[in-house]
Amino acid sequence: MIPTLDEAATVADSVRAARAALPDPEVIVVDAGSGDGTAAAAAATGASVLSAPGTRAEAMNRGAAAATGDVLLFLHADTLLPAGAGAAIAAALARAGAGAFRIGFDRPRPLLERAINARSRIFRIVYGDQALFASRRAFDRVGGYRPLPIMEDRDLAARLRRSGGLVLVPLAVTTSARRHRSDGHARTIARNWLIQLLYTLRVPPERLARRYPPAR
């Protein structure tokens, strides 16, 4: 499942990388009403395209409901799966109900990548740009994504981890550092870590979303 809003510049590459990395995947793009041709760009790759205005959580639940497979993978439109992803996912799901990938950026940032991957490895805290995946049974058992306006990915990962375990696979996705480029590296890191800290301190996601509107 790939949720999108105005991602015409990246969605085709994401779909192509998924097709190359996974054995015969069912690719579903769930679009929130893009005005830049995202839906057409996705359809041109052969992906199924659904329309689902609303939050990213709602989009991913819509995609999961439409999917026919036993394994669900949630992929950001600016994130590329690595070669060998299919085998890595199968190995992870033989051990646990869910998993995620390590992270790498399209413009390498070694210190940040090491910090994020250490956090994921030690605490099993993962986010949507790490291509979270789960067996359908595990996803359904925890009730899918909760209707949160922000931090929906961390919330789902935590519930999956508690329910049936979550494995960090030894491969890295490549995700765009475009926000670092547009907003500045230091500012982006500070903003992200502040949101994570406030969420950990149980500040309601609705309040966080009002203060820090999420990218769709």
Give each language-model segment a name:
Residues 72:
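Short aromatic/hydrophobic "clamp" motif used to bind/position activated sugar donors
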Residues 97-107, 116-137, 141:
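A recurrent flexible, glycine/aromatic-enriched loop bordering the glycosyltransferase active site
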Residues 6-20:
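Short, well-formed alpha-helical segments that are part of the catalytic scaffolds
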Residues 51-67:
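Glycine-rich, basic loop-to-helix element that forms the pyrophosphate-binding segment
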Residues 9-13, 36-45, 84:
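Acidic helix N-cap motif at the loop->helix transition within catalytic regions
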Residues 158-216:
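Hydrophobic helical membrane-anchoring modules
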Residues 83-111:
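Conserved donor NDP-sugar-binding/catalytic core segment of glycosyltransferases
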Residues 31-39, 79:
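A conserved acidic beta->alpha catalytic loop
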